[in-house]
Structures are given as C-alpha cells and as structure tokens.
Amino acid sequence: MALNSISKSDWQYLVTGFFLTSVFIFTDLIGVINKEYFYFVPRLISDQPHRIFTSILTHADLNHLLSNLGGIIITRYFLMRLGNKKRFFYLKFILSCSFLNFFIIWVYEKILSYFNIYPNYAAIGFSGIIYALFGFLLLTSFYGKKYFLGKEISFKS
C-alpha cells in the first residue's frame, strides 16, 4: 500500500478530527453548548465522570484546535509508516491515555489535598494524547516495533 493512499483504518483519524471540529463548532462558533460542561475539573469527576472523555474534545481556541488536528495528521503518518496491524489501535490508545490522564491528575489532586492545597484548574484539549503518541513513536523507534512494554504490538519490522 502506498503511503499516500487511504487505508481501511483511516476512519479512526477522520472520526477523531470530526469530533474535535464538531465540538469546537457547537461550543465556540455557534455557542449552543457551554464548553465549561466539558472541562476536566478533578473535584467534579465523582459526580460527572463524562468529563474524563469530553475534556479531550474541548479546545481553548481555534489555534489550539488546529495544532491538535496537525498533530493527529503527523502521528497518523508515522503510525502508518510503522505498519500497525492491530485493529482500533489509535482509538484504544486515545481511551487508554484518557484514563491515564484522569488517574495522574486524580493522584496529583489527592497529594495536594493531603497538604490542604486545593488548586482550582481545568484541563482541556487533545494535546496530552498527541504528546503521548509522539512519546510512543519515539520509544518504538528506540526499542523496536514488535513489542512494547512486554506486549506484542505487531508493527512490521
């Protein structure tokens, strides 16, 4: 398969881009939905667990959205070069990173609350997942394409 052709798994990237763009249109351009309902705010997660996933769909502004869409295109190119044979790898990676992001922020919040520090912040955007994908690509280039952290990932050698 040529690198400039569309593969069967490209729908994963198109769906991601479509959702990011759609949420931006509905929250920022049309204003139908208040994007503050999507922010990842650690103290609200127990009552509103949907924020674990919706926060990655929300972006601060058009530049933030465009930089994340550019990151999706770049990581798609390199993942395609690696020759991923696993189905739904990209979507599984996104979901895994969302849970990992939630866990890290939750632990951070618990550590700070132990010292009676309660920061007021919200996390938004797809940037963390893009950075995780770049880190994954960097590690697979160093350590090989067949196994990652002891698990078979089935990239061509």
Predicted segments, located by residue:
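N-terminal membrane topogenic signal
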Residues: 3-16
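Polar helix-capping/helix-linker motif
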Residues: 8, 46-48, 152-157
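N-terminal TM1-TM2 helical hairpin plus the immediately adjacent luminal interfacial "cap"
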Residues: 16-123
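Residue-level detector of alpha-helical segments with a strong bias toward transmembrane helices
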Residues: 74, 111, 135-138, 142-145
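Alpha-helical transmembrane bundle and helix-membrane interface signal
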Residues: 80-87, 139-157
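Internal alpha-helical transmembrane segments of multi-pass membrane proteins
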Residues: 90, 125, 129, 153-156
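Membrane-interface micro-motifs in multi-pass membrane enzymes
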Residues: 118-142
